[in-house]
Amino acid sequence: MKLSSGKKLAAASAIAMLACSVLASFVSAQEVSPVEDSPTRSYVLVDQFEHTTTRYTGGNENEDALRFNTSGWIGGDYNRLWIYTEGTKPYKGKLEDADVQVLYGRLVVPFWDLQAGIRYFKPLSSGPSRNYAVVGVQGLAPYRFGVQAAAFVSERGDVSARAELEYELLLTQRWILQPRFAINIALKAVREQGIGRGLNDVEFGLRLRYEIRREFAPYIGVSWQKRYGGTAQFARARGEDTGGGSLVAGVRLWF
C-alpha cells in the first residue's frame, strides 16, 4: 500500500521521536542522576530581531529586510518541548526563508539535549515549502561554544543537515561580542527549492551587543552568506546573486 507524503512524514517523525526517547532513556540512565524532573519552567530567547541591509556580490541593488531568530522551551531540567523560528521579511516583499521547528528534547548528558520532532521550511527561493522529520543535538561544547546540529528528512525522502556554532566573548560585564557560523548541506539536489547536492551555503555573523539589562540588549554587527555548488547554480539561473554581506542592527531579549 502506497503512503501519502503526510503519512510518510508522520511515520518518520514518530520513528525519530521514538529513537530519541529510547536513546535518551538509555544514556540518561547511565549518565544522569535518577532524580525526579524539576518543576515546569519556560524560557524564550529572541536572539536576533534586526534590520539588515544586504549588499550583493553580483552588483544587484541593496536589499533592506527584517530578520528574526527565536527559540524557546517549556519543561524541566530533563524533558523539554522546544520551538525554534527563523525567517526574513524584505520590506518590499513577502515573508521568505521561513523555518519553524517543534521538537521534544531530552537531557542525555550535562549541557546536552537530544532532540526530535517536526520542521516546516520555506526556502529563500520561490520554491515550495516542505515538512520534515528532525533528529538533532543542542548544547555546550568545551570552552562554552554553543552547538546546534540536526538532520532533516522531508516528506519526499530528501535528506539534509544543518549545523550552527556560536560563542559569547565578554569584553566587559555589559559589552559582549558574539560570532556565529552556520552551514547547510544536502545529500541530493531538490530543484524545486533551489537546493543543490552537497554543500549548500555557509553564513558567518559577528554581533556586538550592550546589555542594558541581562534581558535586553541592542546590538550592531555584520553578516556574510555564500551559496555553493548546485545551490549557487540554481540561484544564478533565477537571476539571483550567490552571496553578499549585510550590516545589521537590532535587539536581543529573553524572558
Tell what function each PLM region has.
Residues 1-33:
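Cleavable N-terminal export/targeting peptides
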Residues 77-83, 110-115, 143-149, 172-177, ...:
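Repeated loop/turn-to-beta-strand initiation elements of outer-membrane beta-barrel proteins
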